[in-house]
Design a protein with these regions (language model features):
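Extracellular mucin-like PTS segments
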Residues: 1-14
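Active-site-surrounding "flap" and adjacent substrate/cofactor-binding loops of secreted or lumenal enzymes
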Residues: 14-17, 31-34, 39-106
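Hydrophobic/aromatic-rich, well-ordered segments within soluble, folded domains that form packed cores
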Residues: 25-46, 169-191, 400
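Short, well-ordered surface patches within globular domains
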Residues: 28, 215, 396, 400-423
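Structural recognition of the beta-strand scaffold that forms the well-ordered cores
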Residues: 35-39, 155, 484-488
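Secretory-pathway/luminal and periplasmic proteins that interact with or process carbohydrate-rich
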Residues: 45-47, 221-231, 388, 415-426
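Noncatalytic, helix-rich "gating/capping" subdomain that lines the substrate-entry/channel surface
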Residues: 71-381, 385, 440-444, 449-450
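Active-site-adjacent "gating/activation" loops or surface patches in catalytic cores
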Residues: 306-317, 436-496
Length: 496
């Protein structure tokens, strides 16, 4: 029977866990052979309080998160950022100024809703939603082709679903706490829109006494036909080269060429015609039924479809308008993430900025202040030495046959490293001038800019130097499609 290793004080005995590793988290009441996680971490977990406005904490990462947030806060103050990248200050100031949001009122949101509802055909309406990055029926996005990583392809997947995975849309989940929370959120938004909205918005919700369940019924038709998280781990499931013509034939009530034109996708490109479906083909059958029953102007449930679009827009834009909508956003966010207190406005505004093209602008300023070229060179040298050591291990691994060793050696030789920050910073010059007094206009401009930039990648070779993580992030990743490692500047500091 395995026993718990003892920490010997005999100098002639090498301890199983060197003191320099740090024993502050070890709980010796657990047998490491049976439950190593609690053996190594339980004391730290018990002794470390979780703040009411946090849903998780990580010892090493959390320390650096807080450190970096303090540095970013300094960089975003008007007197520090205006002289370098004024758009940062404009966007962040417009987000933090809740007083102006309340003074401006709900009209910017209502204007956006009116614009969406007057787009025209179903195809134009869905395209309007997608150009502004609001969920509606499905999603189209640009990805690397898994069979030719040098080329981007247009991909099609689920979209416009307010719950995170397939299981939440199954019939037996309707009374689960997560689904009930979502229904309450939709119901709260609908009531706020009826109270504060204009005549057009009120007319959509008039008589829809159970609109939250009605919207969930619509979503469920699509949601139950997506891959489960487990199924999504199978690359074969995630790559169905159905082609643009195949999708067109399967959903006869939707003009995909008209949609593509309205959303800004060039259908003459091979990378568009070779469209890849990331869901089961039955999702397209479900989409066809939703189009007939909900989306078409003469559909029996067309008003529910409009309510679905308006609620998805409102949920996405709630943080950027008046206090009642901001409060509902916070309430629902706390329920979803298990918090009992609100995060400060700073954290939300920082997150929205980071998810915009200005996130890279903020990273550029962070690197200028906190990550020198000498630090980058030192990190590059460290990674190269680690790879060299790994190469020696490959050569001395007797359990590998020669063919496997040669393949691993070739992969190691061809691996590229991206250290600290991009060699070429992406430009946000095409982004419309942002204003400190118009947050919603800023948000909409950023969303359209991101969509336009993504579609511009179609028909061009994949930019293998593009970063999908901000350089100030405390994280790192490996991209298997291009065999590259990315180490942001944010993680290249102690204790990492």
């Amino acid at each position: 029977t395995p026993t718990t290793p003892s920490r010997s004080t005999d100098a002639s005995t090498t301890p199983l866990i060197p003191e320099k590793v740090g024993l502050f988290g070890v709980d010796e009441s657990f047998n490491p052979c049976n439950d190593f996680y609690n053996y190594a971490c339980n004391k730290w977990a018990v002794d470390t309080p979780l703040a009411h406005n946090e849903s998780y904490i990580s010892y090493s990462f959390h320390t650096l998160f807080l450190k970096n947030e303090r540095e970013l806060s300094k960089l975003l103050s008007p007197d520090r950022s205006t002289g370098y990248f004024p758009q940062l200050s404009e966007f962040f100031s417009s987000c933090m100024d809740e007083g102006t949001l309340d003074t401006v009122g709900l009209q910017p949101l209502l204007t956006a809703v009116d614009e969406m509802l007057s787009a025209g055909s179903v195809e134009s309406t869905v395209a309007w939603m997608h150009r502004h990055q609001f969920g509606a029926l499905f999603s189209t996005y640009v990805t690397q082709s898994p069979v030719n990583s040098s080329l981007p392809v247009l991909s099609l997947g689920t979209g416009g679903l307010g719950l995170p995975s397939k299981s939440y849309y199954e019939a037996d989940a309707r009374n689960s706490s997560r689904v009930v929370a979502y229904l309450n959120h939709l119901d709260s938004l609908a009531k706020l829109l009826v109270t504060h909205g204009n005549a057009q918005v009120r007319s959509i919700f008039a008589g829809l006494d159970n609109v939250a369940n009605d919207v969930l019924d619509l979503e469920s038709r699509l949601g139950v036909e997506q891959w489960s998280p487990e199924e999504s781990r199978d690359p074969q499931h995630m790559y169905d080269a159905i082609g643009f013509a195949g999708v067109d034939a399967r959903t006869t009530s939707f003009d995909w060429s008209a949609y593509a034109s309205a959303v800004g996708i060039d259908t003459s490109l091979p990378s568009v015609q070779q469209l890849v479906l990331h869901e089961p083909r039955t999702m397209l059958d479900a989409l066809q039924s939703v189009l007939v029953d909900y989306a078409e102007p003469t559909a029996p449930h067309n008003r529910i479809f409009k309510a679905y679009l308006v609620l998805h827009m409102t949920s996405a834009l709630a943080p950027f308008v008046t206090a009642p909508f901001r409060d509902e956003y916070l309430r629902y966010s706390n329920v979803v993430h298990g918090r009992t207190e609100d995060l400060s406005r700073f954290y939300y505004c920082l997150g929205w900025l980071e998810n915009s093209p200005l996130g890279m602008v903020l990273s550029q300023l962070y690197v200028l202040r906190h990550f020198s070229h000498d630090q980058r060179a030192a990190a590059e040298d460290l990674v190269e030495r680690v790879q060299a050591a790994f190469g020696k291990r490959l050569d001395n691994s007797a359990w590998l046959d020669e063919q496997s060793r040669a393949g691993a050696r070739e992969k190691l030789t061809k691996m590229t490293n991206h250290i600290g920050f991009p060699d070429v910073w992406p430009s946000a010059e095409g982004l419309a001038l942002l204003r400190s007094d118009s947050l919603l206009a800023n948000v909409m401009a950023v969303r359209v800019f991101q969509t336009t930039e993504a579609h511009a990648e179609l028909g061009k070779p994949v930019d293998q130097g593009k970063w999908y993580m901000l350089p100030h992030e405390v994280n790192a990743y490996y991209d298997p499609l291009i065999n590259s490692i990315f180490f942001p500047a944010g993680i290249l500091q102690a204790p990492f």
